[in-house]
Amino acid sequence: MEEVINGILIREVETKNIMTKSSLPVGGYSVNPYVGCTHACKYCYASFMKRFTGHKEEWGTFLDVKHWPEIKNPKKYAGQRVVIGSVTDGYNPQEEQFGNTRKLLEQLIGSDADILICTKSDLVVRDIDLLKKLGRVTVSWSINTLDENFKNDMDSASSIEHRIAAMKQVYEAGIRTVCFVSPVFPGITDFEAIFERVKDQCDLFWLENLNLRGGFKKTIMDYIAGKYPELVPLYDEIYNKHNRSYFEALEVKAEKMAKKYDCAFVDNEMPYGRVPQGHPVIVDYFYHEEIRGTENTGKRNR
């Protein structure tokens, strides 16, 4: 089936296996119920997927709805990290119609897997019933601003206020939550202000720097020149001259914030668990390509 719905080209595709071994620093399995993502984030690293899928359409204008054989033995993934939404958002608006992510969660019940859901949507609250049954589940929302105008410039996903409200609802349902401040835009993202808004409803507060590479580097640099011309010298230093001092200073700032609020400060994610309300673990995920295998030692792979 192929049709255009609300300006999005929708295809239904068959796949042999929905579970894919992950190359992410968090390891385990990467699971993407869709190909493509209709949030159309201007800075999206996942746009590189077009090289492998053969899509000619602009990123954000297409979505492949996957059909896969039912997961017959979910216990196979016991103790494994399963990341849902590494190169898509399983809760894109089309999920309301197709229900792929809900179907996936139903098939993973009883797996005892350590499930991480990455989203920019409030639709996830629909599935709180399943999240409770799954047990070891973490839901992460990307929130890198409190400014809805900047957010709207960057993506067409749920509003920041809706994401924060969904986080609160999921947290209060007893499910571990993450505020993923990603990507941190130099001179724009105020992570301390975001922390103040979410610290009582998240267990982890991740910080990741804006990476600019490939085709979207020019898109973002042009956006900064047009909307924030005063930041052009800073972006030139970071992204053309590869000066890391800005983000190194933010690391120091984040560690001070952790001490102020009596929060753990680590360079990778903690093992599954909850923390006292108001004291989320602050995760220094800046330059995360250096983190793999460090096991929170603070000694990165430079």
Language-model regions: role of each:
Residues 1-138, 146-149, 160-161, 165, ...:
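Conserved Radical SAM active-site core
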Residues 2-14, 192-302:
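Auxiliary Fe-S-binding modules of radical SAM enzymes
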Residues 29, 82, 115, 139-141, ...:
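Hydrophobic faces of well-ordered beta-strands that scaffold small-molecule active sites
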Residues 83-92, 122-125, 137-157, 186, ...:
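Conserved radical SAM core fold
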Residues 109, 171-172, 199, 259:
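Anion (oxyanion) recognition and catalysis
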Residues 120, 142, 266-270:
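Conserved beta-strand termini and adjacent loop/short-helix elements that scaffold enzyme active sites
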Residues 133-139, 199-204:
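Glycine-enriched alpha-helix->loop->beta-strand junction motifs that scaffold or abut catalytic
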Residues 156, 168-189, 240-244:
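Conserved strand-turn element in the central/C-terminal portion of the radical SAM core barrel
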